[in-house]
UniProtKB/Swiss-Prot annotation:
GO biological process, one term: xylem development
Source organism superkingdom: Eukaryota
Gene: VUP2
Function in brief: Involved in the regulation of plant growth.
Species, as recorded: Arabidopsis thaliana
Keywords: Kinase, Transferase
Region named Disordered: 84-130
Note: Plants overexpressing VUP2 exhibit severe dwarfism.
Keyword Cell cycle: no
Biased composition (Acidic residues): 103-121
Name this protein carries in UniProt: Vascular-related unknown protein 2
Transmembrane segments: none
Keyword Transferase on entry: yes
Molecular functions (GO terms): kinase activity
Length: 196
C-alpha cells in the first residue's frame, strides 16, 4: 500500500520538462511556485538511508506540502547529517579540522599577548610624548593666572607647531592603516585633474 501511495504522489508531481513548458508559455514575471516545483522535482530523487530506499513524501499526508511542512528542514537536516558523517569517518578531514582549531587558538593567544603589551606601554608615564607635555604645560599656565593674552608669540608658535605635528602624525597613521588594507588616500584635486 505504501508503494502505491508513493507511485501516485510521484505521478502527480510536475516533471522538469513540464515546468519549463509552463515557464516558456508565460512571458510575464516568474512565479515562486515554479521555483518551488523545480526544487521538489530536483529533490524527487530517492535517498538511500540505512539500507532502505525512502522518499521524503512518505511522512506527508498531502500531495504537495505547504510552507509549514517539515520538507525543507528535513532536507537541511539530511545534508548536515551527511556532512557530519563524512567528516567523522574521514581521518584526513579530522586532522585538518584539528590543525585549523590549533592555529586559531595560537592566533588568539598571540593577539591577547600583543594587547597586553600595548596596554603596558600606553599606560606607563615614562612613554609620554613631548607633544603632550608641552600642551599640559600650556594648560598649567592658564591655571596659574597666565591667560592667552599674556602668552608670548614663541609659546603660541610652539603650541601651533605641536598641534600641526599631532595632525600630521594622526594623518600618517590613518594613511598607513588604509594602505595596510589596500586603500589609498588621494587628494580630490589630483583626482579631478586625472579625470579632466
Amino acid at each position: 500500500m505504501e508503494n502505491s501511495v508513493n507511485n501516485c504522489v510521484r505521478q502527480r508531481v510536475f516533471s522538469n520538462h513540464q515546468i519549463r513548458m509552463i515557464h516558456e508559455e508565460e512571458d510575464h514575471e516568474e512565479s515562486s511556485w515554479i521555483v518551488y516545483f523545480e526544487d521538489i522535482d530536483h529533490d524527487d530523487e530517492m535517498v538511500e538511508t540505512e539500507g532502505e530506499m525512502t522518499h521524503y513524501y512518505d511522512n506527508d499526508s498531502s500531495m504537495i506540502s505547504d510552507a509549514a511542512s517539515p520538507v525543507h528542514t528535513t532536507k537541511i537536516n539530511n545534508v548536515v547529517r551527511r556532512k557530519a558523517n563524512n567528516i567523522n569517518t574521514n581521518p584526513k578531514k579530522r586532522r585538518i579540522i584539528h590543525q585549523h582549531k590549533e592555529e586559531e587558538e595560537e592566533e588568539l593567544q598571540k593577539g591577547e599577548e600583543e594587547e597586553e603589551d600595548e596596554e603596558d606601554t600606553a599606560s606607563s608615564p615614562s612613554n609620554k610624548t613631548k607633544i603632550f607635555s608641552v600642551l599640559d604645560h600650556a594648560n598649567d599656565n592658564t591655571r596659574y593666572g597666565k591667560t592667552m593674552d599674556n602668552v608670548t608669540s614663541e609659546e603660541i608658535g610652539c603650541i601651533t607647531e605641536t598641534g600641526s605635528k599631532i595632525k600630521e602624525i594622526m594623518n600618517e597613521e590613518f594613511s598607513a592603516e588604509l594602505k595596510k588594507r589596500g586603500l589609498c588616500v588621494v587628494p580630490l584635486s589630483m583626482l579631478s585633474n586625472f579625470i579632466a
